[in-house]
């Protein structure tokens, strides 16, 4: 799996709203602040106790959601949203599914362009920087993203109502609200203080922090926090280098891959459109994930 790609998720969400049934998006808040809030969700665990060298994410809920049980978690969320009959909850299901598709498509690309000197964190950060700089016309390494997306760092009661029961049923975890409160507070702190350094002083300080304190296994290294000042164009694959993606050899540039992801997300949105529009029809869902659910008819 790849590192946090919340910025990329955000832009793809914006470009994918047109694939969602208009009855679901009608009168729903799809502002930049809301989209970035949901763009954070899939990788929220990356921010849990992010600058605490002594505590790690022992719950790993975010990581578990992204694992083999993802289809079962998503199905529970879909069922919850359908029964609650709340368009906001249905829309959240789309964002969760989109995030999954993005990671599935981006993982082979990031692995292909990672090297010993340019690890996955560096590649992911470069990708985020490229799309932010391109779309916003400002430099991400100088931008306080906590201010830029000022109202994006808290899940509301509707959000918790959607994910709480599915997380209990699929993963047996009973503290979803507190877990995601900690994650989103960590995200706010990260984007407010840790992700940029206008003077460059944080880079050596992070190196010292990692060397003396940050030794916990699976704990994110502070040296990966900063966005790069310059875009490494080799990661954009402008030379059309071939790489393997899901057993197929491809040579997409980063921008071409973005368009391919949109095509895949359109398919994913059709799956949810069919489910919510046709009385919980799971045929498309089962076909997409190659699964078979013995669904009991809801009263």
Regions of interest found by a model, annotated:
Residues 1-94, 98-299:
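N-terminal leader/auxiliary helical segments
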